[in-house]
Every structure is written in C-alpha cells, then in structure tokens.
Amino acid sequence: MFIPEKIGTPLSPNATKVMILGSGELGKEVTIAFQRLGVEVHAVDRYDNAPAHQVAHFSYVIDMTDAAAVRELVTTIKPDFIIPEIEALATDELVRIEQEGLATVVPTARATQLTMNREGIRRLASEELGLPTSGYEFCSTFEEFTAAAERLGYPNVVKPVMSSSGKGQSVVTSAEDLESAWEYAMSGARVSNQRVIVEQFVEFDYEITLLTVRGIDPATGKPATWFCEPIGHRQQDGDYVESWQPMEMTAPALENARSVAARITNALGGRGVFGVELFVSGDDVYFSEVSPRPHDTGLVTLATQRFSEFELHAKAVLGLPVDVTLTSPGASAVIYGGVDSPGVSYAGLAEALAVAETDVRLFGKPEAFTKRRMGVAVSTAEDTATARDRATLAAAAVTVHG
C-alpha cells in the first residue's frame, strides 16, 4: 500500500489528495482529520451540502454506485487515496481503479467489495477463516427464507445482505412474523430483489465494537495492529443509540475479541481503522460484522481517546505513527431529528452544554427525518455509568425544530 514520502500543500500542484466517498458525519470528521495533516480533501456524496461537503476543500454530487461517474471523478481529481465512508458504492469499479494504479483504495478495494455485502464478509469470516459466528443461511426467495427460519429455529434475525444503519433488520419470533420480516428486509435493502441473511439468535451478554487499527510500526517500518479499548453500545431497530468506552470485559473475552479482530482485519489487509462488531457471551466471542472504516459507535472516541478514531484512520492511511491511548471513560448519545423537515433549527444547546464534561456535535445535515441521526452528545466522567447518564441528559436537552 502506497505511503507518501512527503505531504504536499493543499490547493497547490504538489498537494497530497484524498477523495472521500460518503460525506456524512463520519466522513466530515475524517475530512477534518486529514486536513489537520495538510491533506487536500475532495468530498463526494449523492446529495448536496452533506456534512463533509461543508468542510472539504472541494465537494461533488454524483451517484456513487455509477461506475462511469466514479471513474470520471477519479480521472479528474487524480487522488492519492480513495477513502470509502459508506457501503453503497461501485465497488467493482474501485477494484479496477486500484488494479490500474489510478489511486490507492483504503484499506483495499477487495475489503470495500467484501464488506458492502454481508454474504461476502460472513463467508470469509466463517467459512474461510473459521471464526465463531451464529448459525446462518442466505436466501433469495420467500420460500427459501421460510425454510431457513424453520431450520435455524426461533427467534432468529433477518437482514438484507446489503443495507446500513439497521435498515431492513428485524427479529423473527415465530412463523407468524415471517411475511412482515421479509417485506421489511426488502424495503430496507439497497437494491430490489436482494438476498437476505437469516441468523440464529445469539444469547449474548453484550455486544462491542473493537476499533482495530492497521498501520506502520515506526520502530520496525513494518505493518502492525493496534486495538482501542472496547466500546459497548446499545442498539435500537438495528441502529446505535448510545455507546461507551471502555466496556468492561473479562481478560479471556478481551483476548478472544482481539484475536478475532486481528484475524479478520489481517485477511482484509491495507491500513486504517476497522470497526469490528462482536457478540460476547461469558468468555466466548462471536464475530458479527466489520466495517473497513471508522464506526458510528466510535463517535465516543471524540471524547475518550488522545486521538479519535478519525485521526487514527488518517494517520494510519498516511503511514504515520498511531496512539490508541484512552484518556478518560466516556459515552456518546445520539440526537435524532424527531421531525421530517429541511433546514431545521436546534434549541437546548445551552442546557446540553451545561452538563458536566460534555460536548455536542451537530452534523449540519440539510434535512431532518424522525429517526435520522442529526448530532451526538459526548461526555466523560470517572466511570462509564456516569458518562452515559451525562450524554443521555445532554442529548435529550437538544430539540430539533422544522
């Protein structure tokens, strides 16, 4: 993977350039992290005035699943790195772009291709690497889905093979739920007539995100892996509501989690931050999913770590030293839109920021939806329980008005 010997000057002929595909709140923080290291950032999304558009040097609106549009933009910008920040991309074209040497895809084009589809990454994890996972089957029709659900037993979890932020995901408790679960999965899929994955329900104690950083060890000049402290999180309808760091784990469970994370990220290759999602039951750890990029539950690291997951991503991509030190226990809580309206206003910021050791990040999205993530409150404290209380209180104080 390419390592720049020097960082150029933005907006000049020698600029070091990154092209970010996906300009939401995570892309915005990644943009800022690269800019602080002197990198010229080109932010791309499917709609105008996305959060990263508002801070990048240049912004573009294209259909990122359109191979020709992606190639044309790459040819125009000539980026050193392409940084995917979402899954819905023309990943086959990214593979060709990488093979032709037009740009380095982060962490690799293959990783981006595999992780956009739950089938690809699950087969890699379970069937090739032998990582512990829940029982699962993939289905193309309602009839296959019904049969798989009966074989796997109830309750089970159904998800489209391609979706994000919990869209189309549901728990099936009996045969009576099958039809509605199938219809919901189809409605939440990125493309029509998509396959689904049916998973046995894992009786777990908790779930974590283990942010795993692949970078260059400055002592040896060789690739190395670092682990941030585990992040606990609470999900609602498949989307994260709050997260906290560190999540208390037994020593054997943490060792197992790091082993699983190292194996899956080594298989994907490249450099950068990976969000490895795991279920934990006692000392046992089960692989769930992996994102080859900063993770939404990792927004808590804006408050808890010496360098946030976004800063770690930028440094690792550029081949610079990384530091995963935790500086304080902390938590994050999501601020939802609550309304369906463009150009919303926010109230309650003074009350939110009056909460001890708390900050608020509003993402600047041009349009609100009832369940759209519009901001986040992040808090620190002597312990995660207090931090969670503070973040939840602050998030509740912020109200969104159409």
Curated annotation (Swiss-Prot):
It is an enzyme of class 6 (ligase). InterPro entries: ATP-grasp, ATP-grasp_carboxylate-amine, ATP_grasp_subdomain_1, PreATP-grasp_dom_sf, PurT, PurT/PurK_preATP-grasp, PurT_C, Rudment_hybrid_motif. One of its GO terms (biological process) is 'de novo' IMP biosynthetic process. Pfam families: ATP-grasp, PurT_C, RS_preATP-grasp-like. It catalyses: N(1)-(5-phospho-beta-D-ribosyl)glycinamide + formate + ATP = N(2)-formyl-N(1)-(5-phospho-beta-D-ribosyl)glycinamide + ADP + phosphate + H(+). The keyword Transmembrane helix does not apply. Keywords: ATP-binding, Ligase, Magnesium, Metal-binding, Nucleotide-binding, Purine biosynthesis. GO terms for molecular function: ATP binding; magnesium ion binding; phosphoribosylglycinamide formyltransferase 2 activity; phosphoribosylglycinamide formyltransferase activity. It comes from the Bacteria. This is Formate-dependent phosphoribosylglycinamide formyltransferase. It comes from Corynebacterium efficiens (strain DSM 44549 / YS-314 / AJ 12310 / JCM 11189 / NBRC 100395).
